[in-house]
């Protein structure tokens, strides 16, 4: 999934830690409420400070998440590649987001 729009606005940031303990800072591009259809929410992330490639695009990562009861943190999970219904919904919402921005 790629993303191409004006970055002259602030994004919330999140730090992801990989299996080796390396921390990477990401900007939260978009959150999606998918609880009604899939029982979870989704977040689209871009690496903090990422520059557009030659085609004017930036790589986007998508995760599902469940917030803790206090709404402050939660667990991010990769979205299964074979979950076509989830990916279709994410793509539809993302495309609407891009069209509006």
Swiss-Prot record:
- List residues traversing the bilayer: none
Q: What is this protein called?
A: UPF0473 protein stu1961
- Lineage of the source organism? Bacteria, Bacillati, Bacillota, Bacilli, Lactobacillales
InterPro entries from the xrefs? UPF0473
Give the record's family classification: Belongs to the UPF0473 family.
Query: NCBIfam families, per this entry?
Result: PRK13678.1-2, PRK13678.1-4
